[in-house]
Amino acid sequence: MKKKTVSLLLSLAVCLTMLPVQGVFAAETETETAAEASESTGNHVENLVIGTIADQNVFNSLTQSDAFGRMNYNGFTQGDFVYRDENNNLQPYFWKSFTISDDGKQIDFTIPLDAVWHDGEPVTMDDVVFTFEYMRDVRKNGSLQNLTEVKVTGDDSASLIFSEPDAYYWINSSCNNNACVYAKHIWEGIDDPTTLDGPEAAIGCGPYKLVSYDSDAQVSYYEAVPENAFLGEITVDKVTVQSYSDETTLMMAMMNGDIDAMYNYANPIDADVIDTVKGTPDIDLGESAFSGCYQMEYGKDRAPGNDQAFREAASFAIDYNQLATTINGEYGKVPGKGVIPPSCKGYDESLGSLEFDADKAAEMLDEAGYKDVDGDGYRELPDGSPMDLSVIPQYSSKSMDMRNRIAEVIMNSLDKVGIKNHVDSDSISNSEIWEDTVTKGNYDISITLTTSGMASYSTAFRYFMGELREGESSWLWGTIRDDSFRDNYYAMTQAVNDEQYIENNQKLQKYVADTMAAEALCWETAFFPYRTDKYTGWENYPSWGAVHATTWYRLTAK
């Protein structure tokens, strides 16, 4: 393979340019160990080495692709407007301050006047106004469809004016999706951000700039930008992001001291891998309750998923203890009927937990008319026609093995009570076929994952929606086409305060518990390990880990 090592020389006076990395530099960076790279001068961390299993091929500040895009969930190279703290509360980041009006129709905010783009250009209010107009008009951000004006009120202050109470909705649903300021001099006139693949695509105004990357070695290098110290002094001078083929290899690198911490968005280290790391000196497992979860939804556009009696019976057929062990080892727990885990805002413990009772499931299926008419060991539909459920685990290039194992447990459980089923092999062959299948509702059981980012506000209920509100265009993977469910979902996401959010969130929990339209498969304990021998100031955010927006300002050398 031809070497694809590149270096990005970021000048304060001219736009970003790309030059080949000299061979001596490439050799040094590829063989340098974390022990050598992480030497610190004074109290600063000289170079923090972060491991990931995400690929490093795309470096575009307006996408969420690969390690670069996912690292920017942490206010890394981009000026994210806000971030979520360890308690899941929103805090200012690029915005120096912000307030939401009582009616939820306005956000007032201030910005720094000394921030710079990584090519040396100043960040201005023109960039901020451009950003919101670009997100609304070009990127068609659904949560900004009712944004009527970006009103500049001072040199460093402005207001977002909405015609509907969407302020709370936008800021909460967007904060984990790279809601950041865009460089007008780069993105103006670009209708499709993914088409920009030159070095200028990586320019941001975050606390770090991309210096170089080596796509063969799957490593990238970053340096701090002192002007963009949004939370105070930046204490980590440089960052190296190194990709690994899988979790086992990544954790071996950490045990060997080659990396200091790991970051995989919404993908904590699997329990079986964690068990091999336990007891290793100077490694904190980074344990916390996980707010995300795997879930399954019954396809309700056709029989038998459109029959609540079938869904209730099938629910009792599933071995939740085996699922919990499969997904999270000894740490997994049987989930509740309301889908969302206890670590999520608004969790309703009164709904109780799911139960496994195969005998009860068989009895309920008989009563609902799902009987083995022809004596082949499998039940038919109540009208006597064959029943063979199509099961589709969500496609993933990195965690398909786990999703297939989950599907196997569910399928074996259903098979034991006479429900014939099969995996839709075409749908799990690639992401395009899978998405086309779920979007059309062509499934009987869909297995998906709510990420911790989605769980923080949009919740698992977003995955179950079969209809959006009028005027909104976005992905649809669910088959709940009930007006009350849709209305409660938007009442939750458009709430103007936490009280309204929780009230409507609990209505959604009760809906799925009462209808068994969908169910969680396991409540997990998350592990995001990090080394403790060289640095202090680590903070393990629940469901997120030790790498987040405040890491760059709080981590110091021992």
Model regions and ranges:
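N-terminal lobe/hinge region of extracytoplasmic solute-binding protein
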Residues: 49-102, 133, 203-204
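A structural "hinge/loop" feature
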Residues: 52-74, 94-96, 121, 165, ...
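Gly/Pro-rich hinge or "lid" segments in bacterial periplasmic/extracellular proteins
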Residues: 67, 75, 85-89, 177-233, ...
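Surface-exposed binding/hinge segments that line
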Residues: 99, 143-190
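Ligand-site clamp/hinge motif
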Residues: 134, 226-273, 420-422, 428
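Ligand/substrate-recognition segments at binding pockets and active sites
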Residues: 215, 372-452, 526
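Detector for C-terminal structural segments
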Residues: 217, 224, 317-349, 402-411, ...
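Structural transition elements
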Residues: 305-306, 318, 334-374, 397-404
